[in-house]
A protein has these predicted regions:
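Long, contiguous interaction/recruitment modules in multidomain scaffold/adaptor proteins
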Residues: 1-17
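Structural marker of alpha-solenoid helical repeat scaffolds
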Residues: 44, 78, 95, 111-112
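Structural signature of tandem alpha-helical TPR/SEL1-like repeats
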Residues: 28-36, 62-74, 96-108
Length: 126
């Protein structure tokens, strides 16, 4: 993590910079680099749901499914109406061969947001 000087250490501004840099790393397909930056942000701001959601996405992209599951679950404890987090948790369960848990969260995502991708994954017809 960047430090502004040896005596002051990380600041809220450097945490914002690290968060934005982590977004860019994830977009550039470097999820492990994103996780490294977000670890410091979350250590300083454990209540930051956006940082946790981004770290969950990075874990998922790095195929670190247990940590992704944990982070998505924490996000959903705080934001139970977050359709994307339900969808992403469902995809995580799907990749772990846990279809019943995946189905539940796919359906919750679709119920919260009628996004065509969520509706297709929910498979309400089955």
């Amino acid at each position: 993590m960047r430090e502004t000087s040896e005596s002051t250490g990380p600041t809220p501004e450097t945490h914002v910079i690290d968060f934005r840099a982590a977004e860019q790393l994830l977009a550039a397909r470097d999820p492990r680099g994103a996780v490294k930056l977000l670890d410091g942000v979350i250590a300083a701001h454990p209540e930051n749901t956006a940082a946790r959601l981004l770290r969950a996405r990075a874990f998922f992209a790095a195929a670190q499914l247990r940590p992704a599951e944990l982070e998505f679950s924490i996000v959903l404890e705080r934001e139970p109406d977050n359709a994307f987090a339900h969808f992403a948790l469902a995809r995580t369960y799907e990749r772990q061969s846990r279809p019943e848990e995946a189905k539940r969260h796919f359906r919750l995502a679709a119920a919260l947001d009628p996004n065509p991708q969520y509706l297709k994954a929910a498979r309400f017809d089955s």
